[in-house]
Structure formats: structure tokens, C-alpha cells
């Protein structure tokens, strides 16, 4: 059992955001290429598609489609810098998804503690 199971859910996990709101984030992150793009964008500043495809065998078109899925989920956004289009990570939706996972973890811990109490009674 986790030590957090005896505590009430963290403030951020008290159903502030409906769990359904995080589903598009989890769906977008369910692809290895998109997960890699998020990792790259989290580690640095805004990047162009050319920078994101550098050293990979992924086409510019494929990366553009993956970035659009991530943008639709609210995980990245594009920024115009002159004629160049840069992409950057948007942490807010990831934070919401983390809070959803915290809520689920708390619910499971709470349910397991109740089961343990019944079994030991």
C-alpha cells in the first residue's frame, strides 16, 4: 500500500477537473512519436518542424500531423516568428492530466484500504 492512501486526496485531485477532460491528452500521448515530440519540446525551447525532424527518419508531413494532434489536445502550440512556425510545449493540460492520475491513484488506494479493512475484520 502506498503511504498516500491514508491521506485525503491532494487538493489538486479533488475532482477539480473532470476525468473526461484528460482523455484527449492520454490519447495523444499514446503514440510513441508524439511522446518523443513532447519529451523534446519539454527539454528545450520552441522548435521548428525542421529541428524536430533533424536526425530522425520521420517526414516533415508526419511530424506536422503529430503536432496537430498534440495541439488539438492542448499539449503544444505553434508560434509564428517571422515566416517561421515554431512549436512549444503547453504544460497546463499535462498538469490537468497529472491531477486526473492523482485522483485515480487516490481512489484506488482508498478502495484497497477499505478492502484491507474488510479482510482483516
Predicted regions and their residues:
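Beta-hairpin "wing" of winged helix-turn-helix
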Residues: 72-82, 86-88
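Short beta-strand(s) of the beta-wing in winged-helix/HTH DNA-binding folds
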Residues: 48, 59, 71, 76-77
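Amphipathic alpha-helical dimerization/coiled-coil segments
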Residues: 1-21, 39-43, 94-121
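Recognition helix of helix-turn-helix DNA-binding domains
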Residues: 62
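N-terminal helix-turn-helix DNA-binding core of bacterial DNA-binding proteins
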Residues: 17-59, 84-95, 99
